[in-house]
C-alpha cells in the first residue's frame, strides 16, 4: 500500500516546520547539484528560511555570473514583449530582484573574508577555495605586471638622469679647460705689460777714470798727493771722448 498524497499547506507546528525545511532544503540542493553534474546545466538555487537565512547553490559557485546572465535574458525578453513599468507589480518584482541580488552579494562578501562558513558543505568549500585561489592568482599577476612596469619606468628615468649627468660633466670639463687657458693668457699678458727695458750704462773713458782715481779734491782746493801743476798737467793730458769734442766744435 503506497503512501498517501501529502496535502500541501503550511505546517503549523514550528518544530515540524523547521525539520521539514531542513530535510527538503538538503534534498533540493542535492537535486540541483545532480542536475548540474548529470546534464551539464548551469543551475542557480536561492532559498531563504523563515528567519531570513540564505541558502544557495550555483554551478561552479558563481552565483553572480548566473544572475547577470538571467538579467540579460530577462532584459532581452522585456525588449521583445513591452511591459508597463509604471505598474506597481513590475516595480515590486524589480525591487525583489535587486534585494535578492544584494543579499547574495553580501553573503558572498562574508564568505570571501572567511565568515559564515558553517552553512557550506565540502563541495561548496572546495569551490570557494578554488575561486579564492583563482582570484589570488589574478591579483598576483596584476601586481607583478605593475611592478615590472614601475621598474621599467625607473630604469628609463635612471638612464635619462645618467645621460644628463654625463652631459653636465662634459660641460664642466670644457669650462674648466677654458678657464685654465684664459688664466694662462692673462698671466702671459701681465708678464709682458709689467716688463721694462733696461738701457745699458755708458762706460766712462779709461783716461777719465785714471784721472779721477789719481786726483782727490779736498775742501780747501788743494790737491792731495801732488802740486797743482801736476794736477793741471794730468788734466791737460786727459783725452776727451768723441761725442764731447763734436759737441764743443758744434
Swiss-Prot record:
GO terms for cellular component: nucleus. Residues 3-57 form the MADS-box domain. Residues 162-191, 206-241 are annotated as: Disordered. The keyword Nucleus applies. Residues 181-191, 226-240 have a biased composition (Polar residues). Keywords: DNA-binding, Nucleus, Transcription, Transcription regulation. It is found in: Nucleus. The keyword Transcription regulation applies. GO terms for molecular function: DNA-binding transcription factor activity; protein dimerization activity; RNA polymerase II transcription regulatory region sequence-specific DNA binding. Residues 88-178 form the K-box domain. One of its GO terms (biological process) is positive regulation of transcription by RNA polymerase II. Gene3D superfamilies: Transcription factor, MADS-box (3.40.1810.10). Residues 171-180 have a biased composition (Basic and acidic residues). Probable transcription factor. This is Agamous-like MADS-box protein AGL8 homolog. The gene is SCM1.
